[in-house]
Amino acid sequence: MTKKLYIKTWGCQMNEYDSEKMADLLDSTHGFSAAQSAEEADVILLNTCSIREKAQEKVFHQLGRWKTLKQDKPELIIGVGGCVASQEGDTIRQRAPFVDLVFGPQTLHRLPEMINELKGGAKSVIDVSFPEIEKFDRLPEPRAEGPTAFVSIMEGCSKYCTFCVVPYTRGEEVSRPVDDVLLEIAQLAGQGVREVNLLGQNVNAYRGENYDGTICRFSELLELVAAIDGIDRIRYTTSHPVEFTDDIIDAYASIPELVDHLHLPVQSGSDRILNLMKRGHTALEYKSKMRKLKKIRPNISLSSDFIIGFPGETDADFEATMDLIQAVDYDLSFSFIYSARPGTPAADAVDDVTEETKKQRLHLLQQRITQQALRIARHMVGTEQRILVEGPSKKNPMELSGRTENNRVVNFEGTPDMIGEFVDVNITDVFTNSLRGEVVRRESEMGLRVAVSPQSIMAKHQADMPDELGVGQFSPA
């Protein structure tokens, strides 16, 4: 009888990527198939996030709901992974002794061995170590699910912003080798993926090793990814302003596959608060980078993260943030009320901004962003936009839905054979969370460029594998 696996995922896109890899890994090693609910599973994994307030308590509340499942089915395996697991470690077992597995973001590749240890008689297994990039060497070939895919190119962050737990939960920055990244993307392109989203906690800081030992910068990686036939769109997240350097800005002039959308978290528009956060830049430096980018891509859509009510934030500091929002003209934000993260330097500061003030400021910020977003969307009416068709519309399953380069959902009438392809549409109407359009051109009329076939990259990787004598051979594909 097929064993069932249930994974509950909280948090960022990196966690979503990790959960997909866990599922693929346990399918390839143990034959686990996906369960639709925790009740029908043989293994339950909770992939946690420590960014939001009271993340630890949220984990234990969820585990409490699963405790009865363990009582009814003693052979059930319950595991906790992700950033809270990395932070809490043994504490999870102390508070929830029925948990069998505790593993960090960098040790998910060891899940098959951990499960085998439990089946061999171990009472529990805990591994929250940081074995750098090892996990990517142990993961199975990626499986595409639709025309878009995430690809992790690096892990961790070395910036140590005073409010952030990432360096403590995912470790410092470690980049995957260039060939490994290109192979994964080529494999996905061979399965029909058209758009890749390159992931990392500080993705612009990518410094991957080339086959000859030299280092590849992020801008150089973008060129290599864009050259793969079938990959016609490139997104990436998350970035840090300090690492958003001129060579990356220049890439927007030479790489048409880079979409007209950038998510570049600034957190605050106040230099005083930015200094307290240890962000390493000023508001003026940030705006200068955005001006350079807009000279190359005048229509680029910009989004950001904002922390509201950081310790010591005054009315003047908040007004500086509002001024920055207007100057940059964001049309989307991920904004959060500040709450201390245990173990971070900011947690020792006095949280002197009242909850009422935080909520008022958050409302004003989101109101301004919404106004700007609506204005930008209205300006798109009558324009022609290229859409990657992702599938049926959520609003009307008889219609299709896709995204523009600037990450807006467009619903339109089309045929099922358009799914996975690009279409050009004329934008006819604007709604709160979507646009409406009419198809004017299909992909066969676009003349999308071809540079390097996915098959040639995969063939090169296979040719580089050592023979029986341990000697690697290379012949051009």
UniProtKB/Swiss-Prot annotation:
Record-listed E.C. numbers: 2.8.4.3
Keywords: 4Fe-4S, Cytoplasm, Iron, Iron-sulfur, Metal-binding, S-adenosyl-L-methionine, Transferase, tRNA processing
Record InterPro entries: Elp3/MiaA/NifB-like_rSAM, Methylthiotransferase, Methylthiotransferase_CS, Methylthiotransferase_N, Methylthiotransferase_N_sf, MiaB_methiolase, rSAM, rSAM_horseshoe
Co-factor: note: Binds 2 [4Fe-4S] clusters. One cluster is coordinated with 3 cysteines and an exchangeable S-adenosyl-L-methionine.
Domain TRAM: 378-441
UniProt-annotated binding residues for [4Fe-4S] cluster 1: 12, 49, 83
Record localization: Cytoplasm
Necessary cofactors: [4Fe-4S] cluster
Residues bound to [4Fe-4S] cluster 2: 157, 161, 164
Any GO molecular function: 4 iron, 4 sulfur cluster binding
A GO cellular-component term linked to this record: cytosol
UniProt subunit comment: Monomer.
HAMAP family per UniProt: tRNA_metthiotr_MiaB
Purpose of the protein: Catalyzes the methylthiolation of N6-(dimethylallyl)adenosine (i(6)A), leading to the formation of 2-methylthio-N6-(dimethylallyl)adenosine (ms(2)i(6)A) at position 37 in tRNAs that read codons beginning with uridine.
Protein name: tRNA-2-methylthio-N(6)-dimethylallyladenosine synthase
UniProt source species: Alteromonas mediterranea (strain DSM 17117 / CIP 110805 / LMG 28347 / Deep ecotype)
Lineage: Bacteria, Pseudomonadati, Pseudomonadota, Gammaproteobacteria, Alteromonadales
Gene: miaB
